[in-house]
Amino acid sequence: MNTAQRFLLDIPDSWEQVDPSGEEPARTRAQALASTDDPREKARINAMFRQGREVTKAARRHGALLVAGTATMYTEGLFMAYGMVFAVNTPKGEELTLPVLSARLGVSSANGVAPKDRIITSAKVPHVGTVARVTGTEVTRLTGDIDVKLLTMHTMMPVPGSTEDFLVVTLASPNLPLKNEVYDLFDAITWTFRFVTDDGVQVSPDGTEGVAA
């Protein structure tokens, strides 16, 4: 019997489930702007924060079960990333490609073309099992005048006891030069995903209960 009622995902301490227009993001934005005198860099920072607001708004519009993100200043510069979890239903026999995932999430590439660096593969999530994963640099139309290029990782988590229901963990970042580091971080976050009962007991891939999560 399927006893999974909710999920847990460990996100870094610097990530928050907050309104991107709130006080903490505003402080980080001010700090980032103060770190440079270059008008072009200031414009880029403002654009990144505007895009961040639109990413989280779009996620909520499309029914995200979880929306989290970070805007953190490091010595090397500003790092931004977003994490979202969506519930989707995939009919039997449907290929798990990036366009399919994008359509399921209600987000299409701005130019309608799959990313050239798209990789469709499998990944091992300890508390879930072997899952499908798609990575790529997506150009996504957020609003009528905003396109954003993001490093993305979509990981399909099969709901225990179902062959068609999935939770999709989507992680994205506009920090394109940090591709390897970003994907390592995303993999580490996704690695912590697990399904649990209402009482917080972990549910194994076959739907049976295990230890407390």
Write out the residue ranges for each language-model feature.
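Signature of long, low-cysteine stretches enriched in small and polar/charged residues
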Residues: 57-157, 209-213
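Surface-exposed amphipathic alpha-helical segments
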Residues: 15, 168-213
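Short glycine/proline-enriched loop/turn "hinge" motifs that connect secondary-structure elements
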Residues: 157-164
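Generic structural motif
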Residues: 14, 88-92, 139, 174, ...
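Structural motif
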Residues: 7-10, 161, 184-185
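Short, mixed charged/polar active-site loops
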Residues: 6, 147-151, 166
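Secretory pathway targeting signatures of secreted, lumenal, and periplasmic proteins
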Residues: 1-107
